Amino acid sequence: VQAKWLPGNDLELKRPEELRLDRLDKEAARKTRSVLMMIGSLMHDYDSFKIPYAGGCKLGARTVAPHLFALEEFGVGIKAGNGNYHITVEKKLPERVVLYESGDTVTENIVMAAARSTGETIIQFASGNYMVQDVCFFLQKLGVKIEGIGSTTLRVRGVNGPIKKNITYAPAEDPIEAMFFISTAIATNSEITVERVPIDFMTLEMLKRKHMGLKFDMTPRYKAANGQTDLVDIHIHKHNGELKALVEKIHANVYPAGINQDNLPYFVPIAAVCKGRTLINDWTYENRAIYYTEMSKVGVNIELADPHRVFIGGPTKFNRDDVVCPPALRPASLLLIGMMAAEGVSTLRNIYTIQRGYEDLAERLNSLGAHIEVFQDF
């Protein structure tokens, strides 16, 4: 694949007639779960192939069973061994695929599998999350007919063969990035405007903050560059320590039924500046809530009730510290927020976990008034 960065942070990709899977960067592939999504697209070009084990954030046991069960419906067999997934393909077209769980990557995988299959496939218990919608919008521009985008049932009519079409597409903005900056503003009692927020993936989050007492202004909706996603600009006002803890627990759910699962962690520093005690229930992952307790190192009064629930007492006077990042993106970025809210100089080590999820984060935070220096410690 020819990859070329263009001015304006655009990326041009050109696929060759034949892919060289033996040249795949295995070390890079093992650092992320996105390598799993190669199966749904490569199954149309190869009778057998292998890809490296999927990696990503260390959040406890993360099964690939949903991918395996759904891809089996398309005639795909997956066996694990010697650090790789070994894939075999005997194509068949299912009329209906019921997902074992409503996950983002498994939905994307199955949508791509259906996109080049003959006929129509109905996908039930699909994720309607923002990244799934972007994949669907992209495939629509390539000629794939997809109905039900944003819902839990997708109807995909494949193009039956290779797709050879030049297109330009702009992925929508990331609501999790927006949540990071909003959480930072609240934890540091700052007044900032976060522009181009995908509001459909932030509505309940903003309602929760409203009932905490946060004051904010929101512009009318306008469209993202993809012509589909609704955006707003949100201006966060200083709260001056007047926020109150919610009586009800704060927990995530599968979109569109609740708070986004990757937005939930950013309620930890928000709860820390609220008056009162907050219960956060992170039921999705086996041990992500355990990583939240690292926030005690920067002064947060946090109590681990069990591997999924933490109680946070506030308000908090954050303190400086020298801390190593946990091996999970969102919990690691919480420590950065706490350090920005603390007086004095803190050190956050092994920041690769954060860097792989947020581009030029230190520079952007410095433009808002933070003082962050990235250095190599040999």
Regions found by a protein language model. Name each.
Residues 1-378:
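Short, structured segments at the rim of ligand-binding sites
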